[in-house]
């Protein structure tokens, strides 16, 4: 039966996991955005061999479930780190790798495949005629990208970037599989103490909804300001 008396204690307990979850989400978002942007650039420039490797990467990481990638990273990253440490005669305890680092690496690798499509679409939306016009006016390659291309590309990408952030927030709920505690995991742990699962999960839902609302509003605000400038 629903008990309102546990809502406030559960709220404060689950709130403790919000900053950690947001920090991991932001870190994954930054890493995946940079990696995805690099992949999109390689595809846009049609760089031989690298373009084919990027395509294989995207197919692999878009097709394999994230939880599988997480476990592959969990069991594979320490071994890989130990191999490279041995190769370079470095003293590193590979098995002391924190689980939160493994989650960030695994999710960044997965989300980068989707972020590459976001940036690829944004790059394809840019009118190449503007590049010709800017170059004819004496713009350098750097000036062309900084003053003409990037402001328009980022505006086109913002809605999908906001969606990507929320995908990361939801994907972090898989982190508990390797004992990393996020909002969802904290709700499970809190409910396990008092057996009020419905109340704990409803509080988690509220946190997710508030974060989604803030991210959406922030993205809309940035997009509106950039559209005025461009």
Where are each of the predicted segments found?
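Transmembrane alpha-helices and adjacent helix-loop boundaries
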Residues: 1-230
